[in-house]
Amino acid sequence: MAFQLDNGYYSHQALAMMRKKKTEPRNAGESSGTQQATGAPGRGPSQRPERAQQHGGGGWQPANPQYAQQAGRGGGQHQGRGGRYQGRGGPTSHQPGGGPVEYQAHEYYGRGVQRQGGMPQHRSGSGGHGVPASPSRTVPELHQASQDQYQATVVAPSPSRTGPSSLPVEASSEEVQHQFQELAIQGQSPTSQAIQPAPPSSKSVRFPMRPGKGTFGDRCIVKANHFFAELPDKDLHQYDVSITPEVPSRGVNRAVIGEIVTQYRQSHLGGRLPVYDGRKSLYTAGPLPFTSRTFDVILQDEEESLAVGQGAQRRERPFKVVIKFAARADLHHLAMFLAGRQADAPQEALQVLDIVLRELPTARYSPVARSFYSPNLGRRQQLGEGLESWRGFYQSIRPTQMGLSLNIDMSSTAFIEPLPVIDFVAQLLNRDISVRPLSDADRVKIKKALRGVKVEVTHRGNMRRKYRISGLTSQATRELSFPIDNHGTVKTVVQYFQETYGFNIKHTTLPCLQVGNQQRPNYLPMEVCKIVEGQRYSKRLNEKQITALLKVTCQRPQERELDILQTVHHNAYHQDPYAQEFGIRIDERLASVEARVLPPPWLKYHDSGREKDVLPRIGQWNMMNKKMVNGGRVNNWTCINFSRHVQDNAARSFCRELAIMCQISGMDFSIDPVVPLVTARPEHVERALKARYQEAMNILKPQGGELDLLIAILPDNNGSLYGDLKRICETDLGLVSQCCLTKHVFKMSKQYLANVALKINVKVGGRNTVLVDALTRRIPLVSDRPTIIFGADVTHPHPGEDSSPSIAAVVASQDWPEVTKYAGLVSAQAHRQELIQDLFKVWKDPQRGTVSGGMIRELLISFKRATGQKPQRIIFYRDGVSEGQFYQVLFYELDAIRKACASLEADYQPPVTFVVVQKRHHTRLFANNHKDQRTVDRSGNILPGTVVDSKICHPTEFDFYLCSHAGIQGTSRPAHYHVLWDENKFTADGLQTLTNNLCYTYARCTRSVSIVPPAYYAHLAAFRARFYMEPDTSDSGSMASGAHTRGGGPLPGARSTKPAGNVAVRPLPDLKENVKRVMFYC
């Protein structure tokens, strides 16, 4: 898609990346494998009647008169290869029986059962190959194949053999904005009257009510890892807790309150067994015999800050605790909410019940966020470099349609092995540390790994005092000394340990651990310290550790279900004294839930192939006997081999086979490179890329040609090479590239080559497939008028990184009615800022005065330039938002969308549907009968298309779980979609079916994917942009998945939803204009 950034002000990159598997390491480059990793109106929108729809007319003038639409506004029908397809604006003839009432998608019953007549037969005739003839509009295509293509909506000039296709002269951003305003004068948007003004504050927002439950699809029963929790009939009381002196440790606070309960439960607490949140609140099931009382508590301090050079007496720590009545927790409103008679969830009551059920596990296990871990809950697995995985379980109480529900799931995370520090350091460095001195890099690695870790000393027999490491000494142990009195007498650490403890330090060349604070440094030799058990490792894992951890967490559905049931049995909630005290009873059976399996959509391929249409089977299909619906053109390409294991002949053979596969798949791909293949060393990547590019351009430039594609062969473990190559190609040279790993070059399977061909095709301007329903205008609330579909996400640096910026990405469809191609923009913003700051911007320009910009505005202009029409409907899929951030994100980002639209013309306010996409939840769905092959896929998971919108969903709001993909390994995680704003008034069937069908349009593979592609692309676009950051802020050492790039809870990794203000963030480098025009990110 060709589009320009308005005024050249923003550094947003045109991105919409295709995703690597989450388990694939960063150095895996871009190689494609054979598997993919993976109505009642709402309360918000106005209910004014909309004006009559005016597709293709009513003042919608194309951006360029030579690309004016050919179709009449009344909707004459066009006879094309695909049978009688309707022109833009014509009535859609819905046929009964094939889908939900508003989604009659071809003459098919249920899951692909063909009705009499079947698919329309695509015959020769007017129009492009394999698709209906329809009105032409301007959609710039950079690389057009020489074969006849799908031209449903494009009139493009003949491509040149020596370079990219000629493009129509594009209007500037100012001209496009002027056209928006002209259109407003000629004919007001038919949807603008249906828009409700943005609420004055987030508190006034009401999320849409559920518009009824879906009915489309084959009904079935699934089991969910939700357990019914009976609401207690108790009088809950809240008390404020003040502990003096204040300590940051929840563990210490709990110990203080625990001491009070042990000593004073009967005498002062009236026999009550309270629960405590570790901070400021204590709850009881009934009143305490006082409204305010002070307690004095003494704890033995086991976490000493004293070491070498100070007294060794164990301290007693006195605390003064004031417990004061605060309020009664009202469960009546919770019951009203669960019954659907109250809009807002009473969060306080839910929090109390959650604290009650967490009290006992917190005492038994190691709590991490909402999970609990123990070495006794499963076998430990070594992850390498001194780390091990612990098994545990996630637990959270949730309001659902069936009432209160306890969500239990299995989890694993990394803990530091309880090793002697000497052994830990040896494992960390993967060498014998006594052989040679530590390098500066070794010291940095050790310090980073051990800072904040708790250790216990081993040189004093049974007296195992504990300390927290604050740093590492710069000197060796033998060089360290400290004063022992006020007269300046100095003693070395080696002498002190020999004389005081009779301990001879052997590793005197190693640094000491520094404990305590920096002002009063205290030293502990490494060899007298052992790491305390039960410390979670919160820093970044390397690739091998991630792979090892994923192997531990990967469980087949039946095994996971059994483990969950065993966990519930082991927790014995019926014997939990705190649950008994508060009257909470937990059903130990998995929830049985009604579900539906949505049918897969028909996909359109080119008519020149033997198979022109395909109906996916169990979420997958292949490219055999099919050709891409729009094959791209690659006239001029070259290859650089960065792998020392691949010989030139093998590399040339691989490139030739790949070129042939691209041709077979429907592309116009030259067999021979424009310049011969060359081999280069990874450390010389920039020199090699620029030299090869210049050599190719010396040949092509006199002919008016361009280098269309670079094929790069990378080592399997390539460090930062992949990121460096992408940054140089896309921000410096203006070149799209395809990276292939050495192992795939040697294997060279047909499946792999076919997958790579899919990626190359969309990188050079082609399309792989299109929904047939899109071509026949049968997608409700998408096909009836120009609709733009957005995806947005923010990825954050790992919690261990203190200052790296967060990356926001927004992608948007650029073709209508196909909704297949997505342009994207990215932006760096303040560290861990969740609200997308650059959706809309206004700034002062010295020459032009007040200027508007931002990602939404730029993508709307891009859509207008590509289609010749303004979007009359916006569907916005937002990834990465937790429930606690719903109100802030909706209020801030919906307001930005509104302002971006209004900046293009005063009354331009297309209706918006804002949907949050969540994958980081713990709901799992299991087949009711694992042995029934009709209800499970080959991996034992539920079938793709399984949707649930009852029982375990929100009591009143519009949400659903959708498993849109087939499982590969482990247990499939359904995506959770929650509608926060809906001015388009989707029905449950309409939005569920649209979302499911879009999951079959992901460009990089012939499988349906687990989340809707625009959200998928946005996540990947943001991930790709990290490669563009300068080395001092970029994190190029590891390829952590989304699960490792987001923090949670009120810890250092917490995300902020406060506007960032004027925090200075280094902008990302600009992409080259010719790269922006294509889907280079796949």
From Swiss-Prot:
**UniProt keyword annotations, A-Z:** RNA-mediated gene silencing
An annotated GO cellular component of this protein is: nucleus
* Regions that span the bilayer: none
GO function terms (MF aspect):
RNA binding; RNA endonuclease activity
The Polar residues compositionally biased stretches are: 29-38
* Domain of life from the UniProt record: Eukaryota
Sequence ranges of Gly residues compositional bias: 72-100
Pinpoint the PAZ domain residues: 420-533
PROSITE patterns, alphabetically? PAZ (PS50821), PIWI (PS50822)
Ranges for region Disordered: 17-148, 187-208, 1036-1065
Q: What does this protein do?
A: Probably involved in the RNA silencing pathway. May bind to short RNAs such as microRNAs (miRNAs) or short interfering RNAs (siRNAs), and represses the translation of mRNAs which are complementary to them.
Protein name, per record: Protein argonaute 1A
Q: Which gene encodes it?
A: AGO1A
